[in-house]
Amino acid sequence: MEEFQGYLELDRYQQHDFLYPLIFREYIYALAHDHGLNRSILLDNVGYDTKYSLLIIKRLISRMYQQNHLIISANDSNQNKFFGYNKNLYSQMMSEGFAVIVEIPFSRRLVSSLEATEIVKSYNLRSIHSIFPFLEDKFPHLNYVSDVLIPYPIHLEILVQTLRYWVKDPSSLHLLRLFLHEYSNWNSLITPKKIIFSKSNPRLFLLLYNSHVCEYESILLFLRNQSSHLRLTSSGIFFERIHFYEKKKDPVEEVFVNDFPAAILWFFKDPFMHYVRYQGKSILSSKDTPLLMNKWKYYLVNLWQCHSYVWSQPGRIYINQLSKHSLDFLGYFSSMRPNLSVVRGQMLENSFIMDNAMKKLDTLVPIIPLIGSLAKVKFCNALGHPISKSTWADSSDFDIIDRFLHICRNLSHYYSGSSRKKSLYRIKYILRLSCVKTLARKHKSTVRTFLKRLGYKIIGRILYGRRTDSFFNLPKSFLYFEEVL
């Protein structure tokens, strides 16, 4: 075991100072609340702002200590789920600034990994009449797949212990423990850790989650190298991220980011095994026999139990055949279906028929998750019935139509490579009818009255995307709508 000790250090020689004095700088809190600012100023321009505001931090700390934690108001119990009560707003402000600071080591590693692998920054992941190339290249050759939800640590102190290998500044870790202890159920084993990670200061907990995942995946890579003499085709580490390089703030982001986060990790590939992390799941796939998949399943279980102190049952990790199981990946339900074809051949006087079976990638639009996403942002109800977008009713006709059109176009571009587009047509119909209902609400009329007054031809244009010849007599906003299309 001693000969492996150097490898198990897990790049801990790359420890970084936390730059603890950054907590006293004002622009840190501006970065914490305005994600549109360019965070590279922390990496490239160290001397961007040398202005310290000790007075602000002293006030925050003093107010934290002046809080009487013995006085609990029942009315405040639902105000702030991370710090329990609304009176801990000062602690939350400091924790958000602290989260920006501790992202610096991870941001440096992310930038260096992108430069080393020469990965091009992609601002728009779109599938225009095709699917993603690696799905077409890899899926037809795979037989078995297993998607396992990565368990959260049973105690948050494990995350702090993991993070201390990345940094040298112990005072920062003590401050981190202070923030974590502010959570009322910090030591509770009953509270689901997934709720803590998803709803309570997601930036800070995502950072801790990244440190936890990077350590366990480094050990997983070590196990792979020790169990196989074949060289890896490729390997690399990406981080789960909330904010990517730059994104326009529009309604389609609300639909996709909340339910289809594009945080992907293609950790390693060898001739027989593929590993990818997506949406907090470890996805293992193989074109070999199930024996190899079973071996890796027990690798994962033992690693979680021995390293992260998380109890996991191997019997609850299923190995599925791609021909009988759909994999939720990149917003598609992907599976392999046999494509049977009959070939008739003739040799001299003898004729024969051959059945030729080929694998074909089948990609489906996930209709139920998409309807759930649209229901969250109030485009429809839980059953998929379109409703008006009340928050947009105060906008101009052109803005309302343009917003709905933008969402429909993005959905069409992304899912145009799907094998079956019936679900996509239903989603587009929900959005277009929601657009009509929003316009009717804006003009304070019923949908039927609005349709009669406007004309069925232009409504058909909105609902079904057909060109019309009667748009010359329409209001100016609808002329803009035709120009946009």
Curated annotation (Swiss-Prot):
One MF term in the entry's GO annotations: RNA binding
Matching Pfam families: Intron_maturas2, MatK_N
For this UniProt record, give its keywords in alphabetical order, as a comma-separated list: Chloroplast, mRNA processing, Plastid, RNA-binding, tRNA processing
State its location(s).
Plastid, Chloroplast
An example Gene Ontology CC term for this record: chloroplast
The record ties this protein, via InterPro entries, to:
Domain_X, Maturase_MatK, Maturase_MatK_N
- Indicate whether Cell division appears among the record's keywords: no
Give the record's GO biological process terms: mRNA processing; RNA splicing; tRNA processing
Function as written in the Swiss-Prot or TrEMBL entry: Usually encoded in the trnK tRNA gene intron. Probably assists in splicing its own and other chloroplast group II introns.
Q: Which family does it belong to?
A: Belongs to the intron maturase 2 family. MatK subfamily.
Per its record, how is this protein called by name?
Maturase K
